[in-house]
Amino acid sequence: MRVRNSLKSAKVRDKNCRVVRRKGRVFVINKKNPRFKVRQG
């Protein structure tokens, strides 16, 4: 999982990407292609 400053470009990389908030952190998760997993904060 990568840590990025901005998830703006990360969420449009694939159509299966979803933005999720967990415990004050923002994640981009992708069930179909897990290599797109990103975390912010």
Swiss-Prot record:
It comes from the Bacteria. SUPFAM superfamilies: Ribosomal protein L36. One of its GO terms (biological process) is translation. Signal peptide: none annotated. PROSITE patterns: RIBOSOMAL_L36. Keywords: Ribonucleoprotein, Ribosomal protein. InterPro entries: Ribosomal_bL36, Ribosomal_bL36_sp, Ribosomal_L36_bact. One of its GO terms (molecular function) is structural constituent of ribosome. One of its GO terms (cellular component) is ribonucleoprotein complex. Belongs to the bacterial ribosomal protein bL36 family. This is Large ribosomal subunit protein bL36. It comes from Rhodospirillum rubrum (strain ATCC 11170 / ATH 1.1.1 / DSM 467 / LMG 4362 / NCIMB 8255 / S1).
